[in-house]
Regions:
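Phosphate-group recognition and catalysis centered on beta-loop-alpha active-site segments
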Residues: 2-244
Length: 244
């Protein structure tokens, strides 16, 4: 069982986080993709959630349906029954967050990205149910989002579950928000990182969990920067670099 350490000490090797499961191997954000990532030995899984029309949290990356399902419209405007009739890449079902939590069973930690609007409250409500029973603990979860207002709402509702602040440009711009949220980490685009800003973030007490690193040379560069985790579509590639 892998938990997210709240301590900011530098670990020997970065954690491996499967991006949308094992997106490079099996269709993203599906149960088979998550199972594949776990079989590849990840420390954590990253997924995306929206709230559908009937209120359930569904695991899906895009606001619109066309790229992955061939459907039309927005996922937030469909009922769960309608969503369950769709398939990702003609083969895989779109899972609910409940199904993902039940599949993982806290064997690895889960990074839930709040992708859609008004996701903080239902995510908090669902997690509190799981945290009151079974093996799940706050340290087995990370909540992240580019929608910082959702992170603020989540923190008002839940002070126990760790938060990571997502940012696509200068990662130092996320530090004030991370401080106000008592966040555990900043999750930047890996291309925005260098030795200086990585050190500044870590010395301020935050972990650095960059996304999405798939090429061997980029994995090596991130290791040279001593990042705390690597979010990747190919967990096996990171493992291979670590092994060498």
């Amino acid at each position: 069982m892998v938990a997210v350490s709240l301590k900011c000490s530098v670990q020997k090797n970065p954690l491996i986080i499967g991006h949308r499961g094992a997106k490079g191997h099996i269709a993203e954000n599906t149960l088979p993709s998550i199972s594949k990532a776990m079989a590849l030995g990840v420390d954590g899984i990253e997924i995306d959630v929206f709230v559908c029309k009937t209120g359930e949290l569904v695991v899906y990356h895009d606001k619109s349906l066309d790229r992955l399902t061939g459907g039309v419209g927005l996922i937030e405007e469909l009922t769960l029954e309608e969503i369950q009739k769709l398939t990702v890449l003609g083969k895989y079902k779109i899972p609910t967050l409940v199904e993902v939590l039940d599949l993982i069973e806290a064997k690895v930690f889960l990074n839930i990205e709040l992708k859609g609007s008004k996701t903080a409250k239902p995510t908090d409500e669902l997690l509190k149910k799981y945290l009151q029973q079974g093996d799940w603990r706050p340290e087995h979860i990370i909540i992240s989002s580019f929608k910082w207002e959702e992170l603020q709402q989540f923190r008002k509702l839940n002070t126990a579950v760790p938060i990571a602040v997502l940012i696509n440009n200068d990662p130092l711009e996320a530090m004030p928000m991370a401080q106000s949220l008592d966040a555990i980490a900043i999750n930047p685009n890996f291309k925005s990182l260098n030795e200086t800003n990585t050190k500044i973030i870590q010395e301020a007490g935050f972990k650095v969990f960059p996304y999405t690193i798939n090429e061997t040379e980029d994995i090596k560069k991130m290791m040279q920067l001593s990042v705390d985790a690597i979010i990747t579509d190919y967990p096996d590639r990171v493992d291979q670099v670590l092994s060498n």
